[in-house]
Every structure is written in structure tokens, then in C-alpha cells.
Amino acid sequence: VWYNTLLRFNFTEEEARAFLTGPGHSAWQWMQNIQSYGGPLPKSVIDKHVILGKKILARQLELGMQPIQQGFSGYVPRELQAKYPQAKISMKRKWCGFDGTAQLDPTDPLFHEMGLAFLEEQDKLFGSYGVYAADPFHESAPPIDTPEYLTGVGQTIHKLFQTFDAGALWVMQAWSMREDIVKAVPKESLLILSLIHISEPTRPEPI
């Protein structure tokens, strides 16, 4: 999905593959913490991942499970800044010794354009099933930490999902959530997963 999306935003095939980590680190990339480490990813591996992804989705549906697909919250290649110098892109600090990643500001017009392209490319490959994961500023700080800004972030991401898929459900992890983002989204459109709540409660009271 990322490979096809980046080709739509002036990346060459080599640049798009160079953004992707090696298979052993892809989980961290989907958590927005790293890019490129262990890459570039061969096109043959990308193609095999598509085949595997389709098999996983088919099995989930066969078992009556609800797939949760990747959404878009602004994580982008660092190299996007050079290609779109007018866009509001912030560079994050190093994470566990890895070079920091880049964040496209949700208030920038390019955010909606790129997010919609990402969801479209995902739909072409796998279809869409109405539930999308997105964790804005996961394990990092927003460029502007005010209630007004974070409210706008929540509204923008919600609008993106609803534009692509009316009635979409946004799924967010509890450990990196921010209250103003949460409150900006209608309750029926947001599901918060508290993945480690039993051992490490993240919030004692409802918001």
C-alpha cells in the first residue's frame, strides 16, 4: 500500500522501496517509529506481502472476524519534505537509537490528499471493511500541544475516514491517545483499544 501510494507523490520505485523497512522491523514501521531500517525492501517481498495479506483477510472473514485495516494519521517518509517543501512536515526526535520519522501535519491540505490516496490504494489491493486504525503522534509529541490544535487533528482524521468510507469506525490505541483528539470525534465513530490496561491502567476514569 505504501509503495503504491508513494508512487503517486513523486517518489521513484527505488525511493518508495527505500522507505520500507526489512520484514523483521515492519511492525515498528507500522507503529510510526522507524523507516528504512533493514531496507530497501525488494519488490518481490512487497508482492509476497500482498498475497499473504489477502490470505489473512480471507481467513479472518471466513472465521467471522472483523478486520481492522491501517488508517492514516500523518506518518510519512522524511524525504517527502524535499518533494513538497511548502507542506507542514515536522521531524521527530530519535527513537531508541533510530533516526526520527516525519509527521505530516493534519491541518495541511496535503494530509487529506495523501490520506485519501493511501486508503484508495489499500482498497484496490485488499478491499475495505469499515474499521481503520490510526494513532496520531504515537510515542511522540504533537507540533502544537493545545486543545484547539488537537481538536482540529481529531476532526480532520475523522473527516478523512468518513470521506473515504461513510460510517467508518476509527480505532485508536489507548496508551498514546490525547483527550482533545478523542473528544473531537463522535462516540459512535471511535473505538479505543486499551491493549495493556490489565497490567498498566492508562486512564482510571472515562473521558
Q: What does each model-identified segment do?
A:
Residues E200-T202, I207:
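Positively charged, low-complexity/disordered segments
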